[in-house]
């Protein structure tokens, strides 16, 4: 966690959808990037379910159905996968509940469940302000406040310290309650406390930690329950213990329990406040307990003023939820202030990053042109942007810091991907190969701008910082379109390059270029693999990436892409120098042995970038980015350098959040293109027939001459794949001028089922002109969970 002075709170000021009314006594859980809020209230108790998508800044009200529970406050609320359990709470003043409801969030279906009572003893009585914690297939209920009076208007409070265990059924439903026999001194009765469960990674049993609460006075004690031995203990702690409190929140991220807000004792006298304020007040103090060392650390003290409104104001009865390493806080009660007959509640939503983000995946190539790359990487959750850098072995002219440039603003959101390497085998054992190096083929690529059906972010969020992304809309393109013809397995497509030789045995992966096409029935993966091609028998292909995309609305960006020569792998310790398009007249910038110069491409809001330029390093600098924090150089003061055709570049990317710039990804290598070879076949279709399947395609949109023939290949099972599943072996199943072929059931019986993403049979189709073979369209025919019979 950052030092107290470096905490970087963020208030979410831009969002869409129906915002829930401000409230207190509500609860929240997280399912992936969703924050789900239920209950609480101010002017009456709320009974609706609200969802906030932290990735799109969007509130929405799901259409729930089934046994919808009544509104409640100060209830138990836990999440097990995609199901949520609600227990107890106040349903109206003086009337509490002990009913249990289950919500299947995948269908927004409520169900009232009736667990069996304990073998000995009574089930939990109606209560509020209890803790309800999940670990494994069990929920643990502790404490709360009950009403001893049967008359809800005559409230007789009774504080509880009973302990129950609720066993869950897998997926849906519950088994029943039990009352574990515990050892040691039991914590005193209390309500509005917090309880979290934590288990050390290396060793140790899971432990439940209870902190604070209320039993006539606020508490600051910490209790530990070993869930294996059922032994209570009071661990000794170091550091400054937070003030006694209730109605606070406790959230676990890593090995830390973060405590925020709540009611605390009022320090000092203020004659302008009410008698209540002199006794208790809300706080915005923020601390964490290291659960491995039981040491408290204060991040924001109770006495720390906030004149700039740079963090959440004091509150109690709010909700807090951890999504990744980010904490979200919403609403809550603002002390004893009142508006008419209601409490004043906070309406704001805040978040705080607790750690720097992890390294993203390697940069992946979507498409390449003679002077640009369209690249992507896997999204990292809860980040604010990405720093993309490149490096090259070619020398370039060192830049002086007084040159200026006006960077463009660009950014596109893409979907997850997979990557692998591949081999191609001849039709028979007697086939041989002679590998030779020749000219580079040119490939033609297509990219897609995915447009989700919902508005993900406001327009102002398209790009976080200036970048060197460039528009490639002035180029031509091809599209790979997979359509499922019947109710058989789904299909997906990749674009890849095969050699000009028909009897190819070995293929070493190089680079890939991807594009996507929407369909309500198919998942499409497209990948272009660069080859060294010749008229003789042989090819060397180096496959870097593939891109998997789910159904979205798409537009086509048209560009030429280039299959590049094989790029020599250079380890991260290799020496590199920057380059220039023209012979430099100034001295070339040098790099110390064992170091590589990295130049910023820009900082991007989303996980894709169009790269046609980068920023030159000032003389004597190894990097222009301040990796230690989120501050970046003023790119307007730096000179830009265009990418050069036929040149290899290395890329790396790092994610940025409120704690700064995280570690960089592993290095990827790509090469700009050289024009001339045919594009990849497009509009691939697969349909079943009596012989097997019918495979058809459309000619390349840019043949760059006459198409002489097509070749189709099938990935087959071999012992080599069993040893290295990521390295596919292909057998040619068709060669000719027709744009279709039959794949027999006998051939399919030998097909390899690729499990790199979803199970699929893999085909490749490529076209040949006078220069040789261009990129191949790689087709993944999705098989569901069927491992053996693709035609069943």
UniProtKB/Swiss-Prot annotation:
Kelch repeats lie at residues 34-79, 83-130, 207-255, 257-303. The gene is HCFC2. Binds KMT2A/MLL1. Component of the MLL1/MLL complex, at least composed of KMT2A/MLL1, ASH2L, RBBP5, DPY30, WDR5, MEN1, HCFC1 and HCFC2. Interacts with TASOR. One of its GO terms (cellular component) is nucleus. It is found in: Cytoplasm; Nucleus. This is Host cell factor 2. Residues 399-447 are annotated as: Disordered. Highly expressed in testis. Detected at lower levels in spleen, thymus, prostate, ovary, small intestine and colon. InterPro entries: FN3_dom, FN3_sf, Gal_Oxase/kelch_b-propeller, HCF1/2, Ig-like_fold, Kelch-typ_b-propeller. SUPFAM superfamilies: Fibronectin type III (SSF49265), Galactose oxidase, central domain (SSF50965), Kelch motif (SSF117281). Its main location: cytoplasm. Residues 419-445 have a biased composition (Polar residues). There is a cross-link at residue 553 (Glycyl lysine isopeptide (Lys-Gly) (interchain with G-Cter in SUMO2)). PANTHER family: HOST CELL FACTOR (PTHR46003), HOST CELL FACTOR 2 (PTHR46003:SF2). GO terms for molecular function: transcription coactivator activity. Residues 359-449, 583-675, 677-787 form the Fibronectin type-III domain. Keywords: Cytoplasm, Isopeptide bond, Kelch repeat, Nucleus, Repeat, Ubl conjugation. GO terms for biological process: antiviral innate immune response; chromatin remodeling; immune response involved in response to exogenous dsRNA; negative regulation of transcription by RNA polymerase II; regulation of DNA-templated transcription; regulation of toll-like receptor 3 signaling pathway; regulation of transcription by RNA polymerase II; viral process.
